[in-house]
Design a protein with these regions (language model features):
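HotDog/MaoC-like acyl-thioester-processing domains
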Residues: 3, 69, 100-104, 111-157
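Short aromatic-glycine motifs in intrinsically disordered, low-complexity regions
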Residues: 8-18
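A residue-level detector for short acidic-glycine micro-motifs
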Residues: 26-29, 92, 97, 112-114, ...
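Short coil-to-beta-strand transition motifs
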Residues: 16-23, 101-106
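Hydrophobic beta-strand-centered segment that forms part of the acyl-chain substrate-binding groove
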Residues: 69-107
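Small-residue-enriched segments and motifs
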Residues: 22-25, 88, 108-110, 138
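Catalytic strand-loop segment that frames the active site of acyl-thioester-processing enzymes
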Residues: 19-55
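Compact, glycine-rich, soluble single-domain proteins
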Residues: 51-70, 84-88
Length: 157
């Protein structure tokens, strides 16, 4: 599969999160083997702790949105709309700092590891854009249903 020609579409066209929960600044690179996105942590105001810091666990949301951007770009290559996915969990998550820096650009990367029956696993990293220092890493699993209407939603409206 070929890489999508730049410039890439804005993240808002690729991921379902909108408004203040749309946390990716832009797509940096993409091909079938993975996607890298830029993140401006200062824009993550809704996820800050009471003291104004940005907890390291927010890296998981950046990673999940990068996975969504990867899927959105692959769908776009096929002429299809982005599909909704659900974060299932993480393995081997490692946070090398207690809080994320607020005043410098970060780079998040998601690389697909395996897929089957709608369950996909990605190797993800979060680094400082300036020097490549790794801040967080882990494997994230997402579920992408074939048909949202077929999901048992219980008492949800």
């Amino acid at each position: 599969m070929h890489a999508v020609a730049e410039p890439f579409p804005p993240p808002a066209e690729l991921v379902p999160q909108g408004g203040a929960m749309s946390l990716l600044s832009r797509v940096i690179s993409h091909d079938a083997h993975g996607t890298s996105c830029a993140v401006d942590p200062a824009a993550s105001a809704l996820l800050r702790a009471a003291d104004g810091s940005l907890p390291a666990w927010v890296a998981l949301e950046y990673m999940a949105q990068c996975i969504a951007a990867h899927g959105g770009l692959l769908a776009r290559e096929r002429g299809a709309p982005p599909r909704i996915g659900f974060f299932v969990g993480s393995r081997r998550a490692s946070f090398r700092v207690p809080t994320l820096p607020l005043r410098e650009e970060l780079r998040v990367r998601a690389e697909p590891l395996r897929a089957g029956s709608g369950l996909l696993t990605f190797a993800c990293t979060l680094e400082r854009a300036s020097d490549g220092e790794r801040l967080a890493e882990g494997q994230l699993s997402v579920f992408i249903p074939d048909d949202l209407a077929s999901l048992p939603l219980g008492g949800l409206p």
